[in-house]
UniProtKB/Swiss-Prot annotation:
Organism annotation: Saccharomyces cerevisiae (strain ATCC 204508 / S288c) (Baker's yeast)
Protein location: Cytoplasm, Cytoskeleton, Spindle pole
Name of this protein: Mitotic check point protein BFA1
Residue numbers of Phosphoserine PTMs: 317
Keyword Cell division tagged: yes
Gene name per UniProt: BFA1
Task of the protein: Part of a checkpoint which monitors spindle integrity and prevents premature exit from mitosis. This cell-cycle arrest depends upon inhibition of the G-protein TEM1 by the BFA1/BUB2 complex.
Subunit annotation: Interacts with BUB2.
Other known facts: Present with 1380 molecules/cell in log phase SD medium.
Any one annotated GO CC term: spindle pole body
PANTHER family reported for this sequence: MITOTIC CHECK POINT PROTEIN BFA1
């Protein structure tokens, strides 16, 4: 196989991919190079960038090219070259990079290396390849392409003259601490009083050991005795022939003992601790009033005046006081209280009696509500009640007509503003209960003289009830709990004969309802059997000829109920 130089101007390189690469290359004998520097354009403002190295294959041969030259290999076999290639195979197999590869692809790479090493004609030399290889392996900084920088990198390196940001206002040399992190050197939680006393003793000892002779002014005697500093400074000998600098002050002496470059100890720094952590001793000359604890004897005015600041007060005489202008008279507003008479509609408040007046007609309806002699369930005569109501309505209407000024009158009708309706002036109102017959009930005392029995038979247990009392004569008499007045009337008497009752019954009750009422009454009597004493004052016998008034009987019969209620409530509390 022979290699000849390839002209790049007339070469049409086919577009191939890595999969289409033909690696079955025959051996070749000789090789030639083609210089690419002839096609380099003349130097201008822009530099020339050589093309990268590439490998192209076709049916006729393979083309190898780099930045300086191009090579073309033919498919003609040569037996003389096989021995050299075998030697190269043995040499390349020693490297790990060229192992476990395909034979055809390895041959192409070997051929490329062989052409580079064997080429001696032309500008391409082995030294150029070695320099490029060394340059790629070097770890020095290389010029890179410009990458997009962040906003922090784009900030100016120097401070702007007119900038008022917080970063420019801070000094660059000072050390900044976060506000959330306090300076631990300023806060010492443990108060080391013993070390402070020792330090005071050391200072007193140093001042005592400094003795300056005013007559000679040529010697300084100093002696340091400290447990912490050791015994390496036991003292100084007399210094003869050396003049003393009189300009040395006490501050310079202190700076000599404590150089400026040394950091101050935490004990010398001020402690920021509240006075509540100390046990403050009462001392009027040293302590401020803010540090004093409150004493009980400070409640007097004299003790409190001791804390006032003494200032010169100028007293102005009343004669020299003059008003700059006329004073404004404020409006006097009356405050509403219980002594202020008021009016609201037709009602007038009387401050003397502290009551509202003007509704006496309305209050008259409630005058007989709380009377003591009023019967609770007494039904009045309907005719009398209707007559009273008509008179009251007529009087109210006449009063309303007399008092009202702006009355609306249309024809024979007048407006009733209280009930919001039209009323005839001449005619009276129609009675809505006209035509209903009245029921006149006889007195209760006369109707209950005869005792009535229930329409059903009683059992033996019910007959022998425990609610009996033994009289002195040995005759059993019924108690008030057993002999209740019946609220109903039956058709059967004690002898079993049917008689027409004197009073017609108002309500018709069935025998089942009457039996239910009877059993409930007996059950109630059993529960209250042990709560009463026989022959009590509240006991009312049915056999008595004279029966008291119904209101008096009911009041006596119900008087014990509140006593029972109070006893039950008190028993549950215990």
């Amino acid at each position: 196989m022979s290699i000849r130089p390839l002209t790049l101007n007339g070469l049409d390189e086919p577009e191939t991919s890595f999969e289409e690469l033909n690696t079955t290359l025959p051996r070749f004998q000789s090789h030639e190079t083609l210089t690419l520097e002839e096609n380099v354009p003349p130097l201008s403002t822009s530099t020339y960038i050589p093309p990268p190295s590439s490998v192209g294959t076709s049916d006729t041969g393979t083309v190898f090219s780099n930045s300086t030259s191009a090579f073309w290999s033919n498919k003609q076999a040569d037996d003389d070259q096989d021995m050299e290639v075998d030697q190269d195979d043995e040499f390349l197999n020693d490297f790990q990079e060229f192992q476990n590869k395909k034979d055809d692809f390895d041959d192409a790479i070997k051929t490329n290396f062989h052409l580079r090493n064997g080429c001696r004609t032309g500008p391409f030399k082995n030294d150029i390849f070695a320099e490029e290889f060394d340059r790629k392996l070097s770890l020095e900084d290389k010029p890179r392409l410009k990458q997009p920088r962040s906003m922090m990198e784009l900030k100016p390196k120097r401070k702007l003259s007119n900038s008022v940001t917080s970063r420019n206002l801070r000094s660059g040399n000072s050390v900044r601490f976060k506000k959330s992190m306090p300076n631990l050197a300023l806060v010492n939680p443990a108060i080391r009083e013993e070390e402070e006393d020792e330090e005071r003793e050391r200072e007193d000892q140093r001042e005592f050991n400094y003795k300056i002779d005013n007559d000679t002014q040529d010697t300084i005697l100093a002696k340091f005795s400290s447990d912490d500093e050791g015994d390496f400074l036991t003292g100084f000998e007399e210094l003869e022939g050396e003049a003393i600098d009189e300009t040395i002050s006490s501050n310079d002496k202190e700076s000599a003992d404590h150089p400026r470059f040394l950091k101050k100890s935490s004990s010398s720094l001020p402690l920021k601790i509240s006075p509540a952590q100390y046990d403050i001793v009462k001392h009027d000359e040293l302590l401020t009033p803010g540090l004093h604890r409150r004493q009980r004897d400070w409640n007097t005015q004299q003790e409190l005046d001791s804390f006032k600041e003494k200032r010169s007060v100028r007293h102005c005489s009343n004669q020299n006081v003059q008003l700059n202008g006329p004073a404004k008279i404020k409006t006097i507003k009356q405050q509403i209280d219980h002594n202020t008479p008021m009016k609201k509609g037709s009602m007038i408040y009387n401050p003397k009696t502290m009551k509202w007046e003007g509704n006496e007609n309305v209050l008259s309806k409630f005058s007989d509500v709380d009377t003591a002699n009023r019967k609770a369930l007494l039904i009045k005569n309907k005719l009398q009640r209707d007559a009273d109501s008509k008179k009251q309505k007529y009087s109210d209407l006449q009063h309303a007509r007399a008092t009202s000024r702006n009355q609306k009158v249309i024809g024979n009708m007048i407006l009733d503003e209280q009930n919001l309706r039209w009323v005839s002036v001449s005619e009276e109102e129609a009675d809505p209960f006209a035509g209903i017959p009245e029921i006149n009930l006889p007195p209760v005392g006369k109707s209950m003289k005869k005792r009535s029995s229930s329409p059903f038979l009683r059992s033996k247990s019910q007959v022998n009830t425990p609610f009996v009392s033994n009289d002195n004569d040995g005759v059993y008499q019924s108690t008030a709990a057993q002999a209740r007045l019946r609220k109903y009337h039956s058709m059967r008497t004690l002898n079993g004969t049917t008689e027409t009752p004197e009073i017609s019954s108002t309500f018709h009750l069935s025998s089942r309802a009457l039996e239910k009422f009877y059993h409930e009454e007996n059950r109630w009597c059993k529960k209250l059997a042990s709560w009463f004493i026989p022959r009590d004052e509240t006991i009312i016998s049915v056999d008595e000829e004279t029966i008291m008034d119904e209101s008096t009987v009911n009041s006596k019969r119900k008087s014990y109920m509140y006593e029972i209620r109070n006893m039950v409530i008190n028993s549950t509390k215990d």
